[in-house]
Amino acid sequence: MSAKFAVAVTAIIKRDDTVLLLKRSPEKAHLPGYWDPCSGRMESGETPEQAVVREAFEETGLDVTPVRVLDTFHFYYGPQQEEFVGMTFLCRPLCHRGDGEVVLSAEHTEARWVKLGEVDGYEMADGLKDVLDALA
């Protein structure tokens, strides 16, 4: 039996008492229109910390530093039910491009800095609100 799996990382970017949430593109196959933090798969040769920094920059244009691991997760995704294991990092933004506006990739249609404790009105994947509530 093969033990192949992919490693995923998630960046919860916290600035003061807010976290950055991104609205998934309606073209996304998985959870279109849901709100989530930056996330993606780790590339060959990367550490989880390097991957979360890269993913945050690719999806938002923000330079971040990982502060600590908040959570670990495991799931199956897609028609082939690819197995993923991953880590959710609390990250702090270091600087912003331009005037501090988030620069979105094609994966998302909107970005919002949401106060901790006010995420209930946002449609999210199971478990994410629990992680965010623990930060409040």
Per-range role (PLM):
Residues H74-D99, R112, L116, L135:
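Active-site-adjacent beta-strand/loop module that shapes the phosphate/pyrophosphate-binding cleft
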Residues L62-D71:
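A short coil-to-beta-strand element that immediately follows conserved catalytic motifs
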Residues M1-L20, L90:
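Conserved N-terminal beta-strand and adjoining loop/helix that marks the start
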Residues K4-A6, K14, P32, P37, ...:
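Short connector loops at helix/strand junctions that flank enzyme active sites
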Residues L90, E101-A134:
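NUDIX/MutT-family hydrolases
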Residues T18-E58:
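Conserved Nudix-box catalytic region and its N-terminal flanking loop in Nudix hydrolases
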